[in-house]
Amino acid sequence: MSTLTNGSVEIHYEDHGGDGRPVVLIHGWPLSGKSWSNQVPALRDAGYRVVTYDRRGFGESGKPGEASSYDYDTLTSDLDALMTELDLRDASLVGFSMGGGEVARYIDTVGEERLHSVVYAAAVPPCLKKDDEHPDGALTDDDVRGMQEQLAQDPPAFFDDFTTNFFSAGGELKVTEDERQEAIALAAQADVHAAVQCIASWVEDFTGGLRKSTVPTLVIHGDGDGIVPLEVSGQRTAQVVDGAELHVVSDGPHGINVSHKDEFTSALLEFLAR
């Protein structure tokens, strides 16, 4: 197990090897770096240096609880620490779901000096918030508070329901029950306080980072995503980022890197090879 320390928080990461360009895979909520198990072997076999890590409060990373903030500036500082610790250059960042927020915020606050390209996979940018300023958003303040309260009251029940929605499109579960249970097991590793606080971070506005982006960008999203709707996120990100490519996975739920792993991995490899 490899770790780095950012401030007082230990961040667990895995450097899976490979001599080619670095590819950093950033996991979704409430999972861990192990959620990329369908992609890591293929990327490594293609010659890339594949790096995964666990967000603070999740997986095997440190769980500072109330001693830490879980806003995206803090979370992105962990990504920046990883990039610096491993001296990753000419790297591709692949952010799934919540991980797309770190990608956009990294570009916004750190820049693109170390980057070759980026991928937003079923990702939260540009902005999920629904209010007077964002009337077409997906989540109101009441929605956020409601989810936080439900999770805090009964984490196992919340994660059971969430993973069903995570992997469903059109009312149909698109993965095996074993695959869903694997996701529940990863979610169970999360610190509940961190998981609750991260829900509030989902609705941060990432438009600034998207507008600054100049590196090649792939947006891949399922058209049946009931967690982060394509119309609110993927389509808009592709419109905001100049020259971005949009790949829509037909009948794809939120967890497309599992449900449609072959299509997802193929699209990712094709993009990275350019």
Whereabouts are the PLM-identified features?
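Glycine-rich nucleophile elbow surrounding the catalytic serine of serine-hydrolase chemistry
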Residues: 95-105
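Flexible "cap/lid" loop of the alpha/beta hydrolase fold
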Residues: 104, 108-109, 113-153
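Conserved acidic catalytic loop of the alpha/beta-hydrolase fold
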Residues: 73-91
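Conserved loop-alpha-helix segment in the C-terminal half of the alpha/beta-hydrolase fold
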Residues: 212-252
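Conserved alpha/beta-hydrolase catalytic His-Asp/Glu region
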Residues: 129-130, 134-138, 149-211
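Catalytic active-site module of serine/aspartate enzymes centered on a nucleophile-bearing elbow/loop
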Residues: 242-274
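Conserved alpha/beta-hydrolase "nucleophile elbow" surrounding the catalytic nucleophile
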Residues: 27-29, 91, 95-97
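Conserved HGGG/HGGXW glycine-rich cap/lid loop of the alpha/beta-hydrolase fold
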Residues: 7-68
